[in-house]
Regions:
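Non-heme Fe(II) oxygenase catalytic core, chiefly the N-lobe of the double-stranded beta-helix
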Residues: 1-104, 109-139
């Protein structure tokens, strides 16, 4: 909502290719050839950079899987994605949960960028995905 109008207009019709491979570079920047080959087998998907929720609110589809913007040189594309991710993750837009025993968090996965911070392996983590009333298309 707060993105400058000129920026909104500039990105309104852009499409982003998302890939599982791209997300792995955040976890393992120095993947082996075999790891890269494995992740490259996953299909890519082209999505609009700006997605409109059925409520009318717009979201930026900029998760870790965002690889490049169609029609832009790779360097320019990745710089744009990084700049928009920096904008979207300013402290004023971030909710960081301080977990306590018994907590349950729910969010609309279609319009929310979410991350897990590193946590102790022995702390336990249980996640379920529930679809309450269908999925919204990302066309």
């Amino acid at each position: 909502d707060d993105l400058p109008d000129a920026e909104k207009q500039a990105i309104a019709e852009l499409r982003v290719v998302h890939s599982a491979e791209r997300s792995q570079y955040y976890v393992r920047p120095e993947m082996s050839y075999d790891e890269i080959t494995f992740w490259q087998k996953s299909p890519t998907k082209s999505c609009p950079m700006v997605w409109t929720h059925r409520s009318g609110r717009k979201s930026l589809l900029l998760g870790a899987t965002a690889d490049y913007v169609i029609g832009l040189p790779v360097e320019e594309s990745r710089a744009l994605l990084a700049r928009l991710r920096d904008w979207a993750t300013q402290p004023r837009y971030v909710y960081r949960h301080e977990w306590q025993l018994g907590d349950l968090l729910m969010w609309d996965n279609t319009g929310t960028m979410h991350r897990a911070l590193p946590y102790a392996v022995d702390s336990g983590r249980l996640m379920h995905r529930t679809v309450l009333a269908g999925e919204e298309p990302l066309n």
